[in-house]
Amino acid sequence: MFGLKVKDATVDSSKQSTESLKGEESSSSSTTSSTSTTQRGGSSGDTKVKALQVAVKKKSDSEDNGQIELETNNLANAPIKRGSNNNQQVQLKADDFGTSPSSSESGQSGTPTPWTPWLATEQIHKDLPKWSASILILYDAPYARNRTAIDRVDHLDPKVMTANYPPSWRTPKWNHHGLWDWKARDVLVQTTGFFNPRRHPDWFDQGQAVAENTQTGFDTDDTDNKKQGFRKQGEQSPAPIALPFEAYFANIGNLTWFGQALLVFGICLS
């Protein structure tokens, strides 16, 4: 109802172009980046556009402090595959983000500098007024002086909202673009900040395997914390899925009209 909706792309034969994209790779040594070029052309019967091939490849530690360079990857596939033949999912490690200069300045590889998120749950708890919000509603009041009354509908308390986070949500997985994860671009496009994660459990680490919340399905590893994120202590039935607190700030400003409700962020109304 609110926000943008993205429809699946369909081919319109009446508007079909005779152009197509074709990726063309050139292999090179480990010290130079591989490149991809595009060529225009194709016949009028072409109905498919090929995605460009983009790649990353990590240099050896003795070359340029082990920085990364391009190697074949197809951005149209999700999750992104590393390499063209092994079909393995990308597992980011600390050294994938480069290294800091060596303290001895000897030219050797320095200490790995892993990327860290800019916002963690603990930071939200430290400054509640900054992250709290109140949902107000304005309605017609004929006997009021200005014919308008304001009432508080709900209050967003980040400490309460994050109390039931699964373990992997304790440190939100923001990538270097400032998005929630690799699918967060869909969240930002299709919502104003309020959405039901039960419709898209795959956005949240398979945090809810069944939309009706009959299973927790938290599929990370076999540790004791596997399914504790959706259960209360000592209870057998799963607790309702927690809406990520950051979702409320995904695509809305500090003062936003939402139907007849007015959302005011950064203040606490008791």
Swiss-Prot record:
Residues 1-115, 215-236 are annotated as: Disordered. Coiled coil: none annotated. Residues 1-10 have a biased composition (Basic and acidic residues). InterPro entries: P1_N. Pfam families: P1_N. Residues 26-41, 98-113 have a biased composition (Low complexity). Belongs to the adhesin P1 family. This is Uncharacterized protein MPN_462. The lineage of its organism: Bacteria, Bacillati, Mycoplasmatota, Mycoplasmoidales, Mycoplasmoidaceae.
